[in-house]
Amino acid sequence: MILLTLLLISSIAIVSAIDTDSSDNQILSVEKSVNQNIFKINHPPENHHELNDLNPTKKSVSKNFDFFGIFDFLFKGEKKYGYWVWSGDMDKVDFDKLSKNGVNVVFLNSYAFKDHGYKDVMNWIKKANDHGIEVHIWMQIFNTGEWISPVKNGTPNTGYFNYKIEEAKYYAGLEGVSGLQMDYIRYEGNAYKDPNGTAAINEFVKNYTKSVKEVNPSLTVSATVMPEANATYYYGQDIPKMGEYVDVIVPMMYKGNYESDSEWTKNTTDWIVKHSGDAKVWVGLQTYQSDFNVTDMPADELLKDGKFAFDNGADGVIYFKWGMNEELDNKKLN
């Protein structure tokens, strides 16, 4: 308690010393940079649109002073570092190396149960846990090889919703599973054609989270989102509303697909954090150049983007995918 009191007193002194004029100039610079950015969608390619409604407000002092990292640690918890792991890569994962490099969470694709069998997957989960690594089951919701509409005959596709929720409840009850990861919780890019689509997705996310937490209240539920201001219009993803239901928002910040740079990563992380409510934000970073150039992203560039993500409010960094840049030294970001 004495330590916290001293920290609070020191923080007040720091806040009072801020140069307001200088801060305002920095904000104008950030606003200009963000509004000049172009968000490009990999598919469908015709859906390119400007990020014209981002208007970041002043960043909190905690993002500008390392001193406040103490508060982040005390109140936000440990930073998360992890990988999405495809079923086909499951047996190749080296937990010794991952643990050594600071990885503490993996998203294992749910098809691993079909491809490897229950026993092998459970042994894999236990091995991960023994290395201090959480396992979250990564589920593909509205795309399992083909797109499935969240709406059927103008109303929520409840039959399909119930099917996926029952599947999720099964995973939620497995020993050693720490979380569930909803991927493809969206439209392909044509949500604007369905006026009930966003509401249907919100209903699914709400019911999914409620149902799995009835099985295991300690589960961490996350949802991947498109890192775009117009995510509702194109994908049916109302990020602020989703943030009311899930524990973690995972924006897919694949800058290569957007033909963007690290400045885009920084500014977009800031926007996502400000629009995710109480949900934590674990930024998804692409381990390769882009979907059009599948060569490794330089390790130092990935770590730089990870630092930008944390500096702008993220609570974790998840790399897509394991098998490329799987030996990143994440401890450099602590």
Model regions and ranges:
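Active-site groove signature of glycoside hydrolases
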Residues: 163-196, 318
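Active-site-adjacent "subsite" loops/lids of carbohydrate-active enzymes
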Residues: 121-129, 134-175, 300-305
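Substrate-binding cleft of secreted/luminal carbohydrate-active enzymes
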Residues: 253-262, 279-334
